[in-house]
């Protein structure tokens, strides 16, 4: 999802964590954010409220030599998602660039669950020794509560660069996109009872034989799967000569109605002439008179 640089909002009523030194690591390392106190969370839980992050600020202040090189990567994860889908936003910037990172959430969370957001950093391609205290991080967090969730307009991540020798061309940031969805049709009671099916859909590499089923669908309750009778599935292994049913009945009927006799134009004229001559000859013979007796 594309993002752009915009001025970050002014901070007020933020929960601030301590500005702590962190060691350089090539592996993801957590930056602990300060969330509302347990008492505040219990109060919101008793009022049956849900919460969201309005705004999160991550302040990065480097403390490395001027010839230090490398890239710092900061990531925000939502632990309600599976591990390979938990990443929500990320930033990359030079290790010597003092910077403020701004993140805006687009979802609510329940206080009955652990607070899902985790903040991590790692450093790549650096000439600074690992385990060196290379920078200080500080997190500022603003949350809000609501009786129920509502649609939240999307706001892209932003940055505020505090080092004059760097610009937005040296920074990159990313935000997760909306999840994919597709319409799923509901099976009616009648179609489920009698095993009725829709039309067969033939996909590339398939044939009618691989998709044709006979009889009602049997459902395996133990495995929760539908068992189909597909007697023609293996027919594609046979040769085309065996499977070819021949010409259709309509083509055969047309062929039977067609004559194999061919005549030239002169032969046709001669046939017509002789036929006409015979007709004239027959019609011109006088009838035998009847005798009067």
From Swiss-Prot:
Transports viral genome to neighboring plant cells directly through plasmosdesmata, without any budding. The movement protein allows efficient cell to cell propagation, by bypassing the host cell wall barrier. Begomovirus genome is shuttled out of nucleus by Nuclear shuttle protein (NSP) and the movement protein transports the DNA-NSP complex to cell plasmodesmata and facilitates further movement across the cell wall. Keywords: DNA-binding, Host cell membrane, Host endoplasmic reticulum, Host membrane, Host microsome, Membrane, Phosphoprotein, Transport, Viral movement protein. One of its GO terms (cellular component) is membrane. This is Movement protein BC1. Binds to dimeric supercoiled plasmid DNA. One of its GO terms (biological process) is transport of virus in host, cell to cell. It is found in: Host cell membrane; Host microsome membrane; Host endoplasmic reticulum membrane. Changing residue 260 to A: Mislocalizes to the cytoplasm. Almost complete loss of infectivity. InterPro entries: Gemini_BL. It holds the Pfam family Gemini_BL1. Belongs to the begomovirus movement protein BC1 family. It comes from Squash leaf curl virus (SLCV). GO terms for molecular function: DNA binding. It is a peripheral membrane protein. Phosphorylated.
């Amino acid at each position: 999802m594309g993002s752009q640089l915009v001025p970050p909002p002014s901070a007020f009523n933020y929960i601030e964590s301590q500005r702590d030194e962190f060691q350089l690591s090539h592996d993801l390392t957590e930056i602990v954010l300060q969330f509302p106190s347990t008492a505040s969370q219990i109060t919101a839980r008793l009022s049956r409220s849900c919460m969201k992050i309005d705004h999160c600020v991550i302040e990065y202040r480097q403390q490395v030599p001027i010839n230090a090189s490398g890239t710092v990567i900061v990531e925000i994860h939502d632990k309600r998602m599976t591990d390979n889908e938990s990443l929500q936003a990320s930033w990359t910037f030079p290790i010597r660039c003092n910077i403020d990172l701004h993140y805006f959430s687009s979802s609510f969370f329940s206080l009955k669950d652990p607070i899902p957001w985790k903040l991590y950093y790692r450093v790549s391609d650096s000439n600074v020794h690992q385990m060196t205290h290379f920078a200080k991080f500080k997190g500022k967090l603003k949350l809000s509560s609501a009786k129920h969730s509502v649609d939240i307009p999307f706001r892209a991540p932003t940055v505020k660069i505090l080092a004059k020798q760097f610009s937005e061309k040296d920074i990159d940031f990313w935000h997760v996109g909306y999840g994919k969805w597709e319409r799923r049709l509901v099976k009616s009671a009648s179609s489920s009872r009698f095993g009725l099916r829709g039309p067969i859909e033939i996909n590339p590499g398939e044939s009618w034989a691989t998709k044709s089923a006979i009889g009602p669908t049997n459902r395996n309750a133990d495995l929760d799967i539908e068992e189909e009778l597909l007697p023609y599935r293996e027919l594609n292994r046979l040769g085309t000569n065996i499977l070819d049913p021949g010409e259709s009945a309509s083509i055969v009927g047309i062929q039977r109605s067609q004559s194999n006799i061919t005549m030239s134009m002169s032969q046709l004229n001669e046939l017509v002439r002789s036929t006409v001559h015979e007709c004239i000859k027959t019609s011109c013979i006088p009838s035998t008179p009847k005798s009067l007796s």
